[in-house]
């Protein structure tokens, strides 16, 4: 039985180094089970298989460098795991972590009045279909959709304004457009038509909840974060409704 120091380190997309460490007690066979053991001391407490990853902090204490991801990108992420016995490095392994595997397909959609981008994994069985509804910015970052698709989902990043054939502003957007998008997604060969979810944040979350209340039979789940229990107007001085249904 010996004490070892396990360190995890990486360089973020801005080139700044981050690191964590923890001391563990090995068993009679010299093995440490990070998922089953709490560290004796270190950058986190308790049993947590990912503790060394989330507890990393920047080695440079400059406050301008304390954000791990300054922007969402598909940047390849390499993490080094090192085992020290005393002050001696015994073994080191570098893991390459991909945000998105190469088997995720991307297809621009502009048909049946629907505008957006479809993401889906190659060569999979029919999957859960997810429509991601952006907020007031009007755009879903590709990396978010691709990341979800990499877990086996078919994702439609839906555009509903600021595009050809669509309203210029987030004002008087017909809810029927989203109903049409759900019905379109159900018919795609990659999708199990009985498994449709809406996902949105901010104004997109407001809209997802409104659509669930208006068209409950069109979907099976709603993921709404940074949502509101109120339905707000548009952002224009006229204070019109952001959404319409049956032309009202």
Regions found by a protein language model. Name each.
Residues 17-18, 26, 76-125:
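N-terminal cap/lid segment of alpha/beta-hydrolase-fold proteins
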Residues 169-189, 210:
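Alpha/beta-hydrolase active-site loop
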Residues 200-210:
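Glycine-rich nucleophile elbow surrounding the catalytic serine of serine-hydrolase chemistry
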Residues 209-248:
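Hydrolase active-site cap/lid region
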Residues 126-135:
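Short beta-strand element of the alpha/beta-hydrolase
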Residues 141-158:
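Short amphipathic alpha-helix adjacent to the substrate-entry channel of hydrolases
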Residues 7-63:
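Ser/Thr-rich low-complexity repeats and stalk/linker segments
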Residues 190-202:
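Alpha/beta-hydrolase fold nucleophile elbow
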